Amino acid sequence: MRILKKFSPLFLILAVIGDFSLPYYLGRSYPGFDQMTMIISQLGESTSPVQTYFNNGSIITGSLFILSSIGVYSFFQSESKGLAQIVAGAIVLYGFGDCLLTGLIKISDTASFFNPAYFLHAAFSGIAMVAMMFVPLLLAYQASLKRQKVVSLFYAVCLLGSLLALFLFVAYYLPIIGSLLSSTRGFWQRLSLFFLYLPALSIAFRQLAHKKR
């Protein structure tokens, strides 16, 4: 347990960088893969030439997120047990729902939304994203209580940026509006993740800074 706490910041940094960069790295080996229009999960479909690498990479990053949560809980526990439970729990849920399950559940490119595997993946991924958004929300609130205006603003911008980008990503499925966003669907998904991962990275750096004291 002590080892997991010690390496928690490293696990979290590797999880964030690994999960965010994986689509760009594997996309180079997928002929015709367009980062602007295609969503990340398409790398794991049965027709993808990098399916195995994507699934294995998702399992690794998901495991790293989960392992990092032990140190995250310990870091916030001294301030608030409730805060520690929610933040660490959100990271665990994200690692499991959006990463591990992505790597374990194989989805056909022809599967409909009501296909059990597709629905399970979509449901857990959505829940995981919402859970992860509680991280900047709570950290912004915590910073505001301490009158740390710049820190509070940073987390608030991350939350609002992620929500706005996620809305534009999901709006693809809406009539009329969807056709206008078809050429930027992949961009909005990645931008939402970018804003979502910044607070997680900040936690890792805060842990490292705390250890140097």
Which residues are covered by each model-predicted region?
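Short, Lys/Arg-enriched, Gly/Pro-containing loop segments at transmembrane-helix junctions
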Residues: K211-R213
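Hydrophobic, aromatic-enriched alpha-helical segments typical of multi-pass transmembrane helices
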Residues: I3-F33, I39, L43, T47-L198, ...
